[in-house]
Protein backbone atom coordinates (compact mmCIF):
# COMPACT_ATOMS: atom_id res chain seq x y z
CA UNK A 1 0.00 0.00 0.00
CA UNK A 2 1.28 3.42 -0.90
CA UNK A 3 2.37 5.54 2.06
CA UNK A 4 0.21 8.63 2.40
CA UNK A 5 1.82 11.59 4.14
CA UNK A 6 -0.62 14.36 3.22
CA UNK A 7 -4.10 14.36 4.74
CA UNK A 8 -7.26 16.43 4.58
CA UNK A 9 -8.36 17.83 7.95
CA UNK A 10 -11.65 15.89 7.86
CA UNK A 11 -12.15 13.67 10.92
CA UNK A 12 -12.02 9.91 10.44
CA UNK A 13 -15.28 8.32 11.62
CA UNK A 14 -14.86 6.00 14.60
CA UNK A 15 -16.44 3.17 12.57
CA UNK A 16 -13.57 3.34 10.07
CA UNK A 17 -10.98 3.49 12.84
CA UNK A 18 -12.55 0.36 14.34
CA UNK A 19 -12.40 -1.38 10.94
CA UNK A 20 -8.69 -0.70 10.47
CA UNK A 21 -8.00 -1.84 14.03
CA UNK A 22 -10.00 -5.01 13.41
CA UNK A 23 -7.88 -5.69 10.33
CA UNK A 24 -4.71 -5.01 12.29
CA UNK A 25 -5.69 -7.62 14.87
CA UNK A 26 -6.06 -10.25 12.12
CA UNK A 27 -2.27 -10.18 11.68
CA UNK A 28 -0.11 -13.13 12.53
CA UNK A 29 1.81 -13.15 15.80
CA UNK A 30 4.25 -15.61 17.37
CA UNK A 31 2.26 -18.54 18.79
CA UNK A 32 -0.88 -16.39 18.39
CA UNK A 33 0.17 -14.31 21.41
CA UNK A 34 -1.38 -11.14 19.93
CA UNK A 35 0.95 -9.01 22.06
CA UNK A 36 -0.05 -5.72 20.50
CA UNK A 37 -1.84 -2.66 21.79
CA UNK A 38 -3.22 0.28 19.82
CA UNK A 39 -3.31 3.82 21.11
CA UNK A 40 -5.63 5.95 18.99
CA UNK A 41 -5.28 9.71 19.30
CA UNK A 42 -8.02 11.91 17.85
CA UNK A 43 -8.27 14.58 20.56
CA UNK A 44 -7.08 17.87 18.98
CA UNK A 45 -5.23 19.07 22.10
CA UNK A 46 -3.33 15.81 22.50
CA UNK A 47 -2.55 15.70 18.77
CA UNK A 48 -1.14 19.23 19.03
CA UNK A 49 1.08 18.24 21.97
CA UNK A 50 2.37 15.29 19.98
CA UNK A 51 2.73 17.36 16.81
CA UNK A 52 4.90 19.91 18.59
CA UNK A 53 7.37 17.11 19.40
CA UNK A 54 7.89 16.36 15.70
CA UNK A 55 8.49 19.95 14.53
CA UNK A 56 12.30 19.78 14.99
CA UNK A 57 12.35 16.76 12.66
CA UNK A 58 10.59 18.79 9.95
CA UNK A 59 13.07 21.62 10.43
CA UNK A 60 16.00 19.22 10.11
CA UNK A 61 14.59 17.61 6.94
CA UNK A 62 14.05 21.04 5.38
CA UNK A 63 17.83 21.53 5.46
CA UNK A 64 18.69 18.31 3.64
CA UNK A 65 20.41 18.86 0.28
CA UNK A 66 18.40 18.37 -2.88
CA UNK A 67 18.58 14.64 -3.65
CA UNK A 68 18.67 15.26 -7.39
CA UNK A 69 15.68 13.18 -8.50
CA UNK A 70 11.92 13.59 -8.33
CA UNK A 71 11.22 10.38 -6.42
CA UNK A 72 13.55 11.28 -3.57
CA UNK A 73 12.31 14.88 -3.60
CA UNK A 74 8.74 13.64 -3.09
CA UNK A 75 9.88 11.36 -0.29
CA UNK A 76 11.68 14.22 1.48
CA UNK A 77 8.70 16.52 1.00
CA UNK A 78 6.45 13.86 2.51
CA UNK A 79 8.79 13.32 5.45
CA UNK A 80 8.95 17.04 6.12
CA UNK A 81 5.16 17.24 5.94
CA UNK A 82 4.84 14.41 8.47
CA UNK A 83 7.03 16.24 10.94
CA UNK A 84 5.46 19.64 10.34
CA UNK A 85 1.84 18.50 10.42
CA UNK A 86 1.61 15.39 12.60
CA UNK A 87 -0.42 17.37 15.12
CA UNK A 88 -2.86 18.48 12.41
CA UNK A 89 -3.64 15.01 11.10
CA UNK A 90 -7.09 13.80 12.18
CA UNK A 91 -5.89 10.55 13.73
CA UNK A 92 -2.59 9.15 14.96
CA UNK A 93 -2.32 5.48 15.88
CA UNK A 94 0.57 4.15 17.92
CA UNK A 95 0.98 0.41 17.42
CA UNK A 96 2.62 -0.89 20.56
CA UNK A 97 3.81 -4.30 21.64
CA UNK A 98 4.41 -6.31 24.75
CA UNK A 99 7.50 -8.49 24.93
CA UNK A 100 5.76 -11.73 25.97
CA UNK A 101 7.09 -14.49 23.71
CA UNK A 102 8.47 -17.00 24.31
CA UNK A 103 7.09 -17.00 27.84
CA UNK A 104 10.26 -18.39 29.40
CA UNK A 105 12.60 -15.95 27.62
CA UNK A 106 10.76 -13.09 25.84
CA UNK A 107 12.70 -11.49 22.99
CA UNK A 108 12.07 -8.24 21.14
CA UNK A 109 12.30 -9.62 17.57
CA UNK A 110 9.21 -11.74 18.20
CA UNK A 111 7.30 -8.75 19.55
CA UNK A 112 8.26 -6.57 16.59
CA UNK A 113 7.25 -9.28 14.11
CA UNK A 114 3.71 -9.05 15.48
CA UNK A 115 3.65 -5.25 15.69
CA UNK A 116 4.90 -4.78 12.13
CA UNK A 117 2.47 -7.36 10.72
CA UNK A 118 -0.42 -5.60 12.51
CA UNK A 119 0.80 -2.23 11.22
CA UNK A 120 0.88 -3.47 7.62
CA UNK A 121 -2.62 -4.94 7.91
CA UNK A 122 -3.84 -1.61 9.29
CA UNK A 123 -2.36 0.32 6.37
CA UNK A 124 -3.75 -2.06 3.73
CA UNK A 125 -7.21 -1.88 5.35
CA UNK A 126 -7.01 1.91 5.44
CA UNK A 127 -6.35 2.02 1.69
CA UNK A 128 -9.25 -0.36 1.03
CA UNK A 129 -11.53 1.99 2.99
CA UNK A 130 -10.41 5.10 1.09
CA UNK A 131 -8.12 6.30 3.86
CA UNK A 132 -4.43 7.03 3.76
CA UNK A 133 -1.79 5.99 6.27
CA UNK A 134 1.97 5.87 6.61
CA UNK A 135 4.18 3.48 8.55
CA UNK A 136 6.65 5.62 10.51
CA UNK A 137 9.10 5.27 13.36
CA UNK A 138 9.44 9.01 14.02
CA UNK A 139 8.45 8.37 17.63
CA UNK A 140 11.96 7.05 18.26
CA UNK A 141 13.34 10.60 18.42
CA UNK A 142 10.89 11.73 21.11
CA UNK A 143 9.72 8.50 22.67
CA UNK A 144 9.96 9.49 26.31
CA UNK A 145 7.91 12.63 25.74
CA UNK A 146 5.27 10.59 23.88
CA UNK A 147 5.18 8.09 26.74
CA UNK A 148 4.58 10.94 29.18
CA UNK A 149 1.81 12.57 27.13
CA UNK A 150 -0.01 9.28 26.49
CA UNK A 151 0.85 7.54 29.80
CA UNK A 152 2.45 4.60 28.01
CA UNK A 153 4.11 2.25 30.51
CA UNK A 154 7.80 1.44 30.13
CA UNK A 155 7.12 -2.27 29.58
CA UNK A 156 5.18 -1.44 26.40
CA UNK A 157 7.21 -0.86 23.24
CA UNK A 158 6.13 1.72 20.69
CA UNK A 159 6.58 -0.07 17.37
CA UNK A 160 5.08 2.28 14.80
CA UNK A 161 3.42 5.66 14.56
CA UNK A 162 0.72 5.70 11.90
CA UNK A 163 -1.01 8.92 10.87
CA UNK A 164 -4.44 8.12 9.44
CA UNK A 165 -6.80 10.28 7.42
CA UNK A 166 -8.34 11.03 4.07
CA UNK A 167 -5.57 11.45 1.47
CA UNK A 168 -4.82 14.93 0.20
CA UNK A 169 -2.71 14.11 -2.80
CA UNK A 170 -1.90 11.39 -5.32
CA UNK A 171 -3.42 8.03 -4.58
CA UNK A 172 -1.98 6.06 -7.47
CA UNK A 173 -0.26 2.70 -7.36
CA UNK A 174 3.14 2.22 -5.80
CA UNK A 175 6.17 1.74 -8.00
CA UNK A 176 8.20 -1.29 -7.05
CA UNK A 177 10.99 -3.41 -8.48
CA UNK A 178 9.97 -6.27 -10.71
CA UNK A 179 9.71 -9.60 -8.93
CA UNK A 180 12.66 -10.87 -10.98
CA UNK A 181 14.83 -8.22 -9.31
CA UNK A 182 14.18 -9.24 -5.72
Predicted regions and their residues:
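Generic N-terminal amphipathic, Lys/Arg-enriched alpha-helix
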Residues: 1-10
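Glycine-rich, charged/polar anion/phosphate-binding loops
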Residues: 22-26, 76-81, 146-149, 169
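A short beta-loop-alpha structural element at the N-terminal edge
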Residues: 11-15, 41
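Small-aliphatic-rich amphipathic alpha-helix that forms the alpha element of a beta-alpha
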Residues: 20-25, 93, 99-148
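Glycine/small-residue-rich phosphate/adenosyl-binding loop
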Residues: 34, 40-115
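Glycine-rich phosphate/pyrophosphate-binding beta-alpha loops
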Residues: 26-33
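Short, electropositive alpha-helical surface patch
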Residues: 146-159
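C-terminal helix-cap and adjacent tail motif
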Residues: 3-4, 159-182
Amino acid sequence: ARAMRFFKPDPVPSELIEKVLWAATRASSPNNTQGWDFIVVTDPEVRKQLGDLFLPFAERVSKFPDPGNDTDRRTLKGAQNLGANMGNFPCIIFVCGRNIYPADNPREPFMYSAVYAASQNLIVAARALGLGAAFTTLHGMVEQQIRTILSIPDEMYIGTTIPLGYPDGPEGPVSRKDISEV
